[in-house]
Each structure stands twice: as C-alpha cells, then as structure tokens.
C-alpha cells in the first residue's frame, strides 16, 4: 500500500483463519508480546496468577475457555497502564501423571511399581508430564493468548518443591499439621486416600450406581431387665453389605420413637415412622408389643451378623447417633467404625476401636477367612447369600435377612481413575483446617467473586463446613512429606524439615532431587536413642497434588529463599479464574494455605465460570465425539470466532454452555464479518487514508461518535468488574449500529467521497479496534495496522474518557429512531410487503415525540413511507399490561400479595410518579411488578423495546405506490448489474430499457427516478432482442459513457 492509501483487500468473504496466522507470524517475528511488557516497565503492576494445568494431555474446551479469560483481562489491564506479567506454569505431580504412566507401561497395581523400582517409575512420570508441552504451546499460541513460556515454572522443579516443604514446615511449627487415623474416601485402585474436597470438584464425581441394599435383623441378647427386648431383632438397613462383617455397634437417635412388633414367630425393633415402609415384611398392622424412646435402647447388647470379632472390647451395643434419621432405612444404623466417618466418631467415644479386615487393594484379609481375597464389591453377593441362607459365617449368630433389594444412588468415584471409592480408616497427615476455619470465612469477605453469589454460596458454605484436609498420599510421584520418624517406637522422635539447608545440616548432603526414592535414602541415627540402634527414616507418603498447586503464589518464585521483596509486593494476586469446581480445588487450597501461612487471602478477585458441555448437553466425551474438534474450528472459523462464542456466553456468569458449530459461526456473522466489512468498505471507497477527526457536523457522524463514546464508557465499566459477556454485548450492539445504521445510511456520502464521512469512519474504526482489542485480538490487529500503519494495537492505551464528543440526547433520540425503524420493518415483514414498496403512513406514538421531530425525514426514507406522524397518544394504540412479580413481592407482602394480584387483574393497578405501583392494599416497588406495553391491533401495531412507545403502519397499497415500488425494484436490479459488470460506483452509464406494454406507464412515470439512482446520463426506452433480462419481463443494455 502507498502512504496515503488503505491496503488493497481481496474481494469476497475474508479468510479469517489465514489472516489470523499472518498476525501470529507477525507477532512472533516482531516479539510484540515482550514489547507490551517492556513498554510498562516502571508502571504499577497488576498481579495475575495463572493456575497450572496438567501437561500429560491435550487442551480441551474448558482449558480454552479459561485461557481466553486469562488473555483478555491482562490485555485490558495492560492497555489501562499496568504491567502484567503472564508466567505460564505446569502442574506436574500426582495421580494424573502416575495413571498415564501406568497405562503406558501396563501397570495395574502398586506392587508392579515397587518391582520396577520407584526411580524408574518416577523417571517415566517426569517424561510423561512434559510430553505435551509443545502441543500445549501450539494451542495456546493459536488462541492468540500471550503467555511467558520461556520463564515458566514447574511443580517438579527443585526450587518450587523447596518452597512447598517450607510451607509444610510452617504448618507443623504452628501446630496446624498432624498425623491422624481417620475414615477417608479411599481409592482401592490407586491405593491412596483422597481429601473430602476432591469429592465435590466435579459433578460427575458422584455417578449413579446400583448397589445391593439389605435389611438385616441383629438378635438382642441380655436386654435391659425391663424392656422386654431379649430375643428380638434390631432391624438395620445398609447399602454396603460388605461392611457387615466389620459391624461393631448400631446407632439410634435418642429422640426418635421406636417400636417392638410381632411378625410371625419373631419380634423386630425399628423406628415407628418406618413401619409403613416395611408393611410387606411385617404386615399392614403388626402387633406393637412395646414403644420406646431411642434413649431407652442405649446400651442394649446384640449378636453381630458375623462372628469374626466376638471378643472385641466394648462392641455390639446400641449407641446414640445424631446422624440417625427416619428418611430411609429403619431408623437403626449399622456401624462399622473402620468404614464410616460418623461410625468412628461415635465408637471412639465409648472405647470401641475399629477392625480393619480390608487391605489397601480393597480385598478382605485373613481375619475374615470366608471372604479372604475377594474385593469388597465382589463379596457383596456372597455375603447376601450367606445372610439369606444363614449359612457359613452367618450361621453362628442367626441374623435374619428380611429384605434384599437393588438400590440406585449417587456414589462417589475417584476423580482420576473413575473407579468407585470406598470409605476406609487410614493413617494420614492432615492440615488442621478446623482450627482456622472461622478465619477463612472472614478472609473470604475480602475477596470479590464473580458471580457474586459464589462468595457466600458455593465457596462460603463450603468454608463453613470445611474439615481437616488429608494431605498425604500413599504414592510415588510428588513432593515428599518432609517428616522423618524413628523406626523404633521405644525411642520416638519426629523431625520436620523445611529447606535444603536444614536437610544438609542433619544428613550431611544437599539433595539435588527431592523426589522419591532419593529423598528416602536420607537417614541418620536417632539422636534420642542412647543405644544408637534406631534410625530416622522418612515416612513414605507424598503430598496431595493440591498442596503443590495451592502453593503456587510463593513457590513459583522460590519464596522465602529468594524474592522476598517481590513476593510481598505481589501478594495477594489481583485476579484468578478457573471453572466453578475449583471452589473445592485450587481456589480452596489457595485459600487454606494463604490463611494458615499469611493470614491473608491469596487473591483479591476470582472469576468462577460454568462448565462447557457437548452439543448433546452432556459432558464432553472423546468416545461420543459430542463436540467440534478444536483444530477444525481454528482452521475453519479462526480463534477470534471461538473466543467470541465462549466469552459472549453466560458461562462467565456461572451458567453452563453447550458448544455448537453454529454458535461459533454466529460470532463470525454477528461481529467479526461486520467489523471486517466496515473496514473493507472504507478501504474500497476512501480515495486516501482518513484523518483523525471528531468535528463533523453531520448528524450521523455526530451520532456514531457519541455512540462510540458510550461504548468506551460501557466497555470500561464492564471490564472493570470482569463482566466480559457484558462487554461483548456492548460491542455487538455498537457494531450493529455502526454497520447496519451508520454505514448503510451514509453509503451515498462515501460514494461521493465525502471527507467528513471518511474521516469519521476512520476515527471510529481506529477507536473501536482499540476497545475491541482484548476481546478480538487478531482481527483488530489487522484492521488497526491497516488504518494506522503502526506497530500493534496491543501497544496502545485504552481510549481516554475525553477522547470523543459526548451527546447523550442525540444518542437517545437516534437509538429510538432505530427502534422505531426496526419495529416498523418487522410489521412490514409480517404483512409480506417488500421493502422497496412505498407505504402511505407510519404513526409513531412515544412519550416525547419532539425528540424524534428532527428525524422524521430520515424515518420516512429508511422505512419507505410517504408520511410519518408523531404523537404522544400511546393509549390510543395500546395499553400497559401489569403483572405482579409474586416471587419477589411475596416474601415482603405476605398474604397481601394475593390481593395485589387480584387488583391488578381487575385493572385497578396505578403506577405512581415515583415508579411504585398501587395495587389494592399494597404498594409495590419497581422490582415487584412488571409492566408490558401491548398493542391494540397487533397486525398493524408493534411496541418499542422497554415499553417506550408504539408504531402503527398503514399497509394500504395504491396503484401509484405499486408503480413506484416497481421502479425501485428495477433500480436495485440495475445496481446489481452495474456491480457485476465491473463498473465503479462513480461511473456514468447509458441505458436502453425494454419494458412490457403493461408496465410502460410505470416505467415512463419513474424514468427520472431510475436514471438518477443508477447514474444514467442517457436513458431511453426501446425494444431489445439481446439485452440482459432483469425482472418482471424487463430487458436492458448498459454501457459506460
């Protein structure tokens, strides 16, 4: 292109993906990203924490969605004058990596890992977690997401891991880390416990599962002397028959009423409220032999269903449990303390220790010989058979199986390997979250959440019920728990280390690798053992991977060993974003560690977006192929199209989003193409590059500049509160006004090379591309560089508030003009009256018709009507229909809400000057009622948006109007013919037209109209044998003069 001309653009639809690749190549060669950071050296910093993804798989739509937000916000903040570092990170430890390696190597259990050697296995994990880094970098780059890959951090790095063990040592020193024996969610496939928050991260952790449910009678022995229960059966219900061999007690609620009933030759005890549920087994009206409060049953002894642990101290008695209800079951709960959290708490209180006959693989051990070696889920069937037949191990104590059914219920599954979990008592290390839970709730109030309801809803409620966090994992690839214990219980000692220096001090060697097995090789004599025979050895567990990622703010910079001042100035972070499930994951662990270590929140602002679903509304699945291939979308529609589709959706306000190819293409149609076509239109018709100007007096120029000023303010407001969908909607609406109103209404001015129009559109596009740059970084880069010839739109500042002239009255008036035209056009379309057919009259009824008075001619021209009449008599053509919003008003008004509804339905509602509604005995506020303007004659009348008024279209068609419409149809066809023959818009032509006899009068009447519109300096009628057929039997020939 020359210095005074816009680039020559290819005709037709743009190849947006190809243009995007050119931009990406330019950015790479120009090092534009680095320049954007360097340009802000010395500026205030905006701290963005980029949550680390796992790199042992390819990115999916969820990653892309979050990645776009992680790009938009830093771009915007950079344009607002901040320096925003964007350091990428990798989450490398934990089960995700281990399971991938197990799959690659054909490993099915931990014994095979031990056989191959921990060193070899962890080497394979290290290679696996970095396997897809190149692919990740390619995807992120194709997104047009700017991140610093060269200075990335990895949770497997020695410096990062040292900061993590420092954090653990800090918790230990504060008394917030301890070893305990608890019932935890346990994955028998991976042979490790999970923390409770991991069960609440994803909706699909709980999957529908069918399990056997049994109701079993346990025989009472030696009952209280006066309660008459000896020989009766306590009915218990359970969906885990495999736990019955470990039964040590049953629980009742002290406040529930229980009954002893006679059924056949047996007596059964259950909650009175559950009698009807067991009518089939106990009879419709069983004989009630006694009624008891639950408190009266406490201490009652019984025979367990299996006789494996008959001598267990304090076992086999009725205990009190506040968790017992009559919602289901029998009101009496079977307790196996090793496999139930509540069970263990209640049992421990009376001195009942748990029995643990299930090994780390979920199989019964030798203590229950009849089921030894069977997996607990597989053993269910045999256990039920033995109870039913009272054979085998169930024969001794004579339990009675009175019901066996299949029970379908949501059941927790491992979030990594997807196998059903069990609950199992294990020794684990914990963070004592319950000690500072209240402080976490307090600090949460300092965080700004989007959506706002997450603060006191999903996140806040989770914090209120937070339990101690199990942080140890019986695995291999992870940050080691830095705890060394004496191997001789006679000389107990625990040492906890928080740095490489401390390890070197005690072990005489500075670790070059903190991973297993090398860290396990560090041993030393126990200083507390005078015999010198015991050794300090590291416990074999590694830390929960969420402890790694929760340490990201300080571990990424090796705090506190380096960068102390930097960390203090960059903590807490200004902004983080992930999907809503991270309220139980990364958001949560960040908050736990920040509260415990620093007594501060880890982040100031958090966006928790919804979930991306496949086009069938289900979770995305590779096997179902229920989502468009990411690469194909990039290749066909481009990254900006995908970015717009995801960012403009409700998903960033907490809703879920179904991904469809049509939805992505709609973004191209609604915004990308209109922006490009406007730029292309300017480049085509402007004789030279426009000049920055905001002083045109033409009403359309003044309007679009003032409208742009509103866009600047609206986008600023939305982006400041992280409302990216709102920002997208503002941009979409402005693009609509720019292309379908300003440019279309100004075409003749551009064809005439009007300098005011050209300079105004140049100015508008220059500002618009800057405003849209964070949302659409690729297409705006192309347009902006074409307009300005400068380096990059992403090296510019956000437009200042005083950059553009404001005119709120003009914007309001012209927007109402557009609404009027839109409503009237819809009426015309409904009547099937073509656009070029003139109509006699349009009535516009609005509250302030004087506002529209200057635009009457514009409205008439736009709508092709001969007369536009303005009036304020809205009630002549429609009425306001009032309805009470009972959901909002009900809680305040109580019973008066029904009287208000009745009054409004009877037409007795009156809107007061202050906007309140008087309805019967009640006065309703503006949000407690709805007002809708309804047209009296819907066939000819339409309401304007927000009840601003009505338009009434007279669709009467006279012969004169039909003739003029016929002429305008021919004008359109002739303009298309000019275009197809390659004529420039300014070329004058000679026209010969052949018209059927029945249309000759119409043609001659409107000859001058036709000739003027198509720039015909010579126009004649004649018979043509070989002219071009256009419409309605007309043939023409044209030639340039």
Swiss-Prot record:
Cofactor or coenzyme needed: Zn(2+)
Keywords annotated in UniProt: Aminoacyl-tRNA synthetase, ATP-binding, Cytoplasm, Ligase, Metal-binding, Nucleotide-binding, Protein biosynthesis, Zinc
Instruction: For this entry, list what GO says about its biological process.
Output: isoleucyl-tRNA aminoacylation
What is the reaction catalyzed?
Answer: tRNA(Ile) + L-isoleucine + ATP = L-isoleucyl-tRNA(Ile) + AMP + diphosphate
- Kindly report, in one word, the top-level EC class recorded for this enzyme: ligase
Primary localisation category: cytoplasm
Positions of ATP binding: 622
Cellular compartments annotated: Cytoplasm
| Disulfide bond sites | none
Q: What is its EC number?
A: 6.1.1.5
User: PROSITE patterns from the xrefs?
Assistant: AA_TRNA_LIGASE_I (PS00178)
Superkingdom, according to UniProt?
Bacteria
How does it associate, per the subunit comment?
Answer: Monomer.
Q: What remark about domains does the record contain?
A: IleRS has two distinct active sites: one for aminoacylation and one for editing. The misactivated valine is translocated from the active site to the editing site, which sterically excludes the correctly activated isoleucine. The single editing site contains two valyl binding pockets, one specific for each substrate (Val-AMP or Val-tRNA(Ile)).
Function of the protein: Catalyzes the attachment of isoleucine to tRNA(Ile). As IleRS can inadvertently accommodate and process structurally similar amino acids such as valine, to avoid such errors it has two additional distinct tRNA(Ile)-dependent editing activities. One activity is designated as 'pretransfer' editing and involves the hydrolysis of activated Val-AMP. The other activity is designated 'posttransfer' editing and involves deacylation of mischarged Val-tRNA(Ile).
| Annotated family | Belongs to the class-I aminoacyl-tRNA synthetase family. IleS type 2 subfamily.
Q: What is this protein called?
A: Isoleucine--tRNA ligase
Point out the gene that encodes the protein: ileS
């Amino acid at each position: 292109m020359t210095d005074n001309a816009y680039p020559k653009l290819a005709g037709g639809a743009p190849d947006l993906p190809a243009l995007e690749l050119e931009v990406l190549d330019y950015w790479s060669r120009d090092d534009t990203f680095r320049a954007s950071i360097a340009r802000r050296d010395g500026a205030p910093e905006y701290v963005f924490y980029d949550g680390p993804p796992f790199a042992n798989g390819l990115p999916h739509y969820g990653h892309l969605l979050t990645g776009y937000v992680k790009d938009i916000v830093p771009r915007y903040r950079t344009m607002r004058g901040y320096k925003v570092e964007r350091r990428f990170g990798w989450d490398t430890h934990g089960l995700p990596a281990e399971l991938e390696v197990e799959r690659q190597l054909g490993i099915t259990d931990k014994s095979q890992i031990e056989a191959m050697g921990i060193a070899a296995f962890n080497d394979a994990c290290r290679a696996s977690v970095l396997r897809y880094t190149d692919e990740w970098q390619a995807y992120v780059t194709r997104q047009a997401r700017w991140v610093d890959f060269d200075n990335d951090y990895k949770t497997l790095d020695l410096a990062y891991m040292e900061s993590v063990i420092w954090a653990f040592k800090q918790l230990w020193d504060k008394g917030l880390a301890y070893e305990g024996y608890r019932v935890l969610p346990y994955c028998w496939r991976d042979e490790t416990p999970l923390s409770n928050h991991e069960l609440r991260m994803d909706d699909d952790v709980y999957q529908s599962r069918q399990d056997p449910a049994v109701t079993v009678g346990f025989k009472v022995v030696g009952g209280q002397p006066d309660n008459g229960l000896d020989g009766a059966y306590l009915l218990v219900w359970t969906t885990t028959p495999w736990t019955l061999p470990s039964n040590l007690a049953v629980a009742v609620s002290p406040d529930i009423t229980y009954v002893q009933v006679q059924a056949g030759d047996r007596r059964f005890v259950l909650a009175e409220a559950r009698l009807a549920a067991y009518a089939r087994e106990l009879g419709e009206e069983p004989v009630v032999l006694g009624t008891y409060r639950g408190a009266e049953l406490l201490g009652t002894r019984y025979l367990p269903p299996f006789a494996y642990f008959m001598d267990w101290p304090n076992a086999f008695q009725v205990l009190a449990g506040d968790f017992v209800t009559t919602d289901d079951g029998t009101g009496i709960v079977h307790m196996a303390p090793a496999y139930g959290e509540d069970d263990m708490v209640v049992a421990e209180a009376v001195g009942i220790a748990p029995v643990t006959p299930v090994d780390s693989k979920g199989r019964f051990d030798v203590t229950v010989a009849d089921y030894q070696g069977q997996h607990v889920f597989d053993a269910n069937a045999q256990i039920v058979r033995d109870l039913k037949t009272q054979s085998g191990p169930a024969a001794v104590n004579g339990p009675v199986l009175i019901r066996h059914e299949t029970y379908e219920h949501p059941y927790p599954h491992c979030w990594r390997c997807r196998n059903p979990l069990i609950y199992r008592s294990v020794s684990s290390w914990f963070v004592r979250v319950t000690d500072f839970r209240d402080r976490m709730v307090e600090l949460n109030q300092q965080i700004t959440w989007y959506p706002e309801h997450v603060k006191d809803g999903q996140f806040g409620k989770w914090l209120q019920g937070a339990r101690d966090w199990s942080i140890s994992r019986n695995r291999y690839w992870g940050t080691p728990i830095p705890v060394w214990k004496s191997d001789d219980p006679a000389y107990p000692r625990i040492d906890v280390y928080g740095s490489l220096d401390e390890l070197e001090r005690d072990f005489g060697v500075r670790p070059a690798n903190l991973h297993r097995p090398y860290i396990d090789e560090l041993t030393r004599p126990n200083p507390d053992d005078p015999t010198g025979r015991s050794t300090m050895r590291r416990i074999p567990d590694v830390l929960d991977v969420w402890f790694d990622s929760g340490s990201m703010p300080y571990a990424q910079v090796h705090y506190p060993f380096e960068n102390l001042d930097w960390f203090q100035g960059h903590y807490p972070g200004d902004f983080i974003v992930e999907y809503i499930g991270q309220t139980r994951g990364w958001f949560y662990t960040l908050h736990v560690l920040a509260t415990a270590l620093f007594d501060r929140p880890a982040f100031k602002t958090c966006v928790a977006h919804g979930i991306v679903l496949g086009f069938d509304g289900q979770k995305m699945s590779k096997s179902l192929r229920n989502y468009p291939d990411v690469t194909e979308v990039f290749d066909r529609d481009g990254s900006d199209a995908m970015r717009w589709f995801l960012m403009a959706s409700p998903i960033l306000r907490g809703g879920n989003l179904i991904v469809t190819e049509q939805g992505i293409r709609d973004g191209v149609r609604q915004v990308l193409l209109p922006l490009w076509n406007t730029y292309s239109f300017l480049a085509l018709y402007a004789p030279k590059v426009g000049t920055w100007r905001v002083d045109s007096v033409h009403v359309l120029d003044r309007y679009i500049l003032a409208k742009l000023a509103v866009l600047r303010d609206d986008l600023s407001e939305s982006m400041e509160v992280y409302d990216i969908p709102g920002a997208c909607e503002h941009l979409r609406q402005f693009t609509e006004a720019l292309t379908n109103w300003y440019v279309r209404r100004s075409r003749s001015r551009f064809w005439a090379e009007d300098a005011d129009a050209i300079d105004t559109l140049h100015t508008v596009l220059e500002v618009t591309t800057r405003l849209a740059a964070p949302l659409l970084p690729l297409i705006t880069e192309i347009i902006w560089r074409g307009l300005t010839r400068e380096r990059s739109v992403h090296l510019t500042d956000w437009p200042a508030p005083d950059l553009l002239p404001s005119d709120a009255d003009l914007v309001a008036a012209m927007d109402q003009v557009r609404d009027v035209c839109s409503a009237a056009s819809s009426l015309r379309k409904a009547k099937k009256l073509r656009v070029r057919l003139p109509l006699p009259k349009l009535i516009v009824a609005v509250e302030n018709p004087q506002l529209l008075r200057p635009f009457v001619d514009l409205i008439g021209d736009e709508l092709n009507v001969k007369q536009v009449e303005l009036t304020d008599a809205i009630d002549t053509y429609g009425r306001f229909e009032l309805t009470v919003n009972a959901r909002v008003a009900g809680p305040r008004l109580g019973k008066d809400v029904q009287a208000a509804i009745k009054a409004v339905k009877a037409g007795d509602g009156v809107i007061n000057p202050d906007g309140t509604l008087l309805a019967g005995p009640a006065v309703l506020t503006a949000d407690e009622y709805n007002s809708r303007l309804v047209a009296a004659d819907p066939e000819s009348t339409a309401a304007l948006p927000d009840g601003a008024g009505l338009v009434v279209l007279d669709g009467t068609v006279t012969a004169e109007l039909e003739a003029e419409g016929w002429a305008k149809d021919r004008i359109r066809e002739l303009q298309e013919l000019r275009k197809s023959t390659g004529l420039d818009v300014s070329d004058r032509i000679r026209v010969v037209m052949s018209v059927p006899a029945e249309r000759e009068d119409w043609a001659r009447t409107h000859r001058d109209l036709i000739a003027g519109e198509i720039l015909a300096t010579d126009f004649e009628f004649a018979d043509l044998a070989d002219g071009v057929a256009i419409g309605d039997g007309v043939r023409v020939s044209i030639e340039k003069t």
